[in-house]
Amino acid sequence: MADYREHYLEIRSAGASVVAVSVDAPDKSEALRVHLALPFPILCDTEHRVVRDWGIYNSGEKGGIAKPAVFVIDPGSVVRYAAVDTVVRRVPAAEIVSLLQNAADVQSVRRRVYIPLFSDWISAIRNLIQR
């Protein structure tokens, strides 16, 4: 989400909005939004309805979370681009900015490799133990 914070003004300048969706409770989502200084809202899907309907529900993590994903939806509610990612491969926000600014072929958007930090590994191990 921090990547989208860094490109937020470019995304808005291209005429788009940014919204994050989380399965966390509203207070936890708001704390994260404040901690990361996100200029966009985090919508809460505590019953996992939206993430299930959009095919991004990951039941194997923390009792069920959303997979990292990006959707570009036009004003007519048509999904123009969708990427369901993994922890280690994500579409950079700069690629979405390019897509929006140039009306580029959506197939040209590339994912980048994310190298997990040590703290990410610790979190993943805790998730496995909590199962």
Task: Describe the residue ranges of each PLM region.
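Chalcogenol-based redox active-site neighborhoods
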Residues: 1-131
